[in-house]
Amino acid sequence: TIMDPYTGNIVAMVGAVGPKTQNLVDNYAVQKHQVGSSIKPLTVYSAALDAGAVTPATTFDNYPVHLLNGNPWPKNSPNTYTGWTMIGEGVRRSINTIAVQTLEALGVADSYAYATEKLGLSLVPEDMGVAPLAMGGLTYGLSTVEMAAAFSSFANSGVYNSPKMYTEVRDSNGEVVLKNEGETHAAMKETTAYFMNQMLTS
């Protein structure tokens, strides 16, 4: 899914590739999928930055900070741990231990509220936990349309535009009978969007 971040217009969407083989099949672009670590900038880093829980210069010790069934958790992929690490490096390398500690500095409830209310993500109450929000193991997942709209807030200086599949409907006389205005709101501070863009492109 490709979205114009300034208008919310969906300009391209691919649901499947190759020849059509049957009718009434699922549209993969709007169906929910597991999003994995791609959720971290949305539910963890931008949320924590915007709330002032961390700054881009905040450091955490890159190691498993909890025990889960007697085993160190979370684990990184690859299974390497490098000591004190800045947030930006955690974003760049998608480090699980840094994401978990950043989320815990913010709080699970605040992360969930930010993601659902500010970024329009259709999370469910069962997703209100450290593992789903920090590493993306969601109950039902998210669609590529939702993800495109949320990430577009970074490109649009922190302003969220709801995704629009059409702009207007006209009748046979060319008169507009339905106009899709969409919904726009400030999802985050402009400085938060700036820092996220810097970290995601470094």
Q: PLM features: residue spans?
A:
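Mid-domain, small-residue-enriched loop/turn segments at the edges of structured enzyme/sensor domains
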Residues: 72-76, 107-149
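Glycine-rich, acidic and aromatic/proline-enriched surface loops and short helix-turn segments
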Residues: 2-19, 49-53, 65, 83, ...
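A penicillin-recognizing enzyme superfamily signal
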Residues: 1-4, 12-13, 19-29, 39, ...
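Conserved catalytic neighborhood of penicillin-recognizing serine enzymes
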Residues: 53-111, 160, 172-201
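Surface-exposed patches in mature extracellular/periplasmic domains of secreted proteins
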Residues: 57-58, 123-133, 161-166
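Active-site SXXK
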Residues: 8, 33-60, 90, 150-154, ...
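Glycine- and acidic
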Residues: 22-31, 96, 128-135, 181-182
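Secondary-structure capping and boundary motifs in well-ordered enzyme cores
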Residues: 2-7, 31-39, 79-83, 87, ...
